[in-house]
């Protein structure tokens, strides 16, 4: 083979060697790149796998803590409500004690008011104009009773005069029945003794007569 014919063959061989070297170099670079990219991914997956039980444990502990917190909050709210109810009951008891502590004393004073009322009713009205002393006595009794009733009112004690009202067993005590067609049945047609209430609580029922049914 001549030198001129061998020269192209040598050049082709050199190109082939260079090409193989280039391909091998690129493959190695790709392999290294693949290996480098794969390692962090594998490490992340491995780390996630290793931490999964711990995350599950923490999740369960968090759920348990939330449930316990909800229970404690519910107990706290119930305790506050119970305390508020107890405070209201105590305040009402104290208020009732202040208001109704004089109830028995008021009942005794009612007898005085009744006596004054009977005394004024007993005075003959037709003789007042001709008897100055009797008139002064009557006026004195009337003023005394009126003053006593004003004192009662200031302390929440008021009379019950249920004439022509519907009979109420909570405030009235029926002594007799009376025929009266001008009113509906069970209506108070006569009051023989006034009742009294202390701050809306009946402390003495009115003694009454009611119409027949």
From Swiss-Prot:
Major subcellular location class: mitochondrion
Bias type Basic and acidic residues, positions: 38-55
Annotated signal peptide: none
Listed Pfam families: GrpE
Compartments it resides in: Mitochondrion matrix
Region of interest (Disordered), residue spans: 35-55
Record keywords, A-Z: Chaperone, Mitochondrion, Transit peptide
SUPFAM superfamilies: Coiled-coil domain of nucleotide exchange factor GrpE, Head domain of nucleotide exchange factor GrpE
One annotated Gene Ontology cellular component of this protein: PAM complex, Tim23 associated import motor
GO BP: any one term: protein import into mitochondrial matrix
Similarity annotation: Belongs to the GrpE family.
Complex and partners: Probable component of the PAM complex at least composed of a mitochondrial HSP70 protein, Roe1, TIM44, blp/TIM16 and TIM14.
Function: Essential component of the PAM complex, a complex required for the translocation of transit peptide-containing proteins from the inner membrane into the mitochondrial matrix in an ATP-dependent manner. Seems to control the nucleotide-dependent binding of mitochondrial HSP70 to substrate proteins.
Protein's name in the database: GrpE protein homolog, mitochondrial
Organism: Drosophila melanogaster
